[in-house]
Amino acid sequence: ALPICLIADILYIESVDRRTFLYTEQQIFETERRLYELEAHLEKCSFFRASKAIIINLQRVQSLRPELGARLLLTMDNKEKIIVSRQYAKTIKNALGVV
């Protein structure tokens, strides 16, 4: 089961060494679920893949700027920075309405 936290509170979800973590401003939760399972579960809630290891909550993105190699640097609303890989940059830009 998912940890008890509001979906809107999740900044991003990260997979590290076969473990999956949900990050909120106050806490980090570990879940048994795999990243692809959470992605399927949350796709209607404005969560998007940022890299092979990270899913971000688009509602919590404060700003973005281009990086070298067609990547993006996102600043979340808690000031944390996340790199979006080239593979997912276009999807994120489209979802945010950036051309």
Describe the predicted segments one by one:
Residues 94-99:
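Short, charged, intrinsically disordered terminal tails
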Residues 1-83:
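Conserved binding/recognition cores within well-folded domains
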